[in-house]
Amino acid sequence: MYEGVVQDLIDELGRLPGVGPKSAQRIAFHILQAEPTDVRRLAQCLMEVKAKVRFCATCGNVAQEELCNICRDPRRDLSVICVVEEPKDVVAIERTREFRGKYHVLGGAISPIEGVGPDDLRIRELLARLADGTVTELILATDPNLEGEATATYLARMIKPMGLKVTRLASGLPVGGDLEYADEVTLGRAFEGRRLLDV
């Protein structure tokens, strides 16, 4: 244990996802040894992100305006929506350059153990987007784990009566893995080989 503010910094850094106690300590000491201008720039960036970034009113992706760059892009295919759990999944898919449609970010996955049900996700907003008949295909790109599969099955059953083509990313993604960690080639092939969901 360190004194006062040093330990406070280590504790706060350790609360970040994927940062364990040793990494938190290493980052804290890097900050302590950094130039004051670098530390101020980091602090300013953190404050600006918190103040300026919001969620897109249409898809739920991160944005600095009411709509994200993807929803504002007129070159995107309006007939296909790819449903993902989190904004970081949008970034992973965009890196593949395989998908030219729009996205819908649910804000998580159905997880009874964590107390997350369908009403806690952006499913109503998705249904509202599908209501005008523009969308012909819905790609379910939730994580290939228990919660992601449950969410995909729930959505497929709910949307099937609408007559839309509902597909799921092909295998090649590790079961139990997170979409954000898949490499571009694997994710690109999963898009190319997506399958029709029959529920």
UniProtKB/Swiss-Prot annotation:
A biological process term (GO) from this entry: DNA recombination
Bilayer-crossing regions: none
Family indicated by similarity: Belongs to the RecR family.
Keywords of this entry: DNA damage, DNA recombination, DNA repair, Metal-binding, Zinc, Zinc-finger
One term of GO molecular function: zinc ion binding
Zn finger residue spans: C4-type: 56-71
Protein name: Recombination protein RecR
InterPro entries for the chain: DNA_Rcmb_RecR, Rcmb_RecR, Rcmb_RecR_Znf, TOPRIM_dom, TOPRIM_RecR
Record's function text: May play a role in DNA repair. It seems to be involved in an RecBC-independent recombinational process of DNA repair. It may act with RecF and RecO.
Highest taxon of the lineage: Bacteria
Cited SMART domains: TOPRIM (SM00493)
Keyword Zinc-finger assigned: yes
Toprim domain: residues covered: 79-174
Disulfide bridge partners, by residue number: none
Organism of this sequence: Streptomyces avermitilis (strain ATCC 31267 / DSM 46492 / JCM 5070 / NBRC 14893 / NCIMB 12804 / NRRL 8165 / MA-4680)
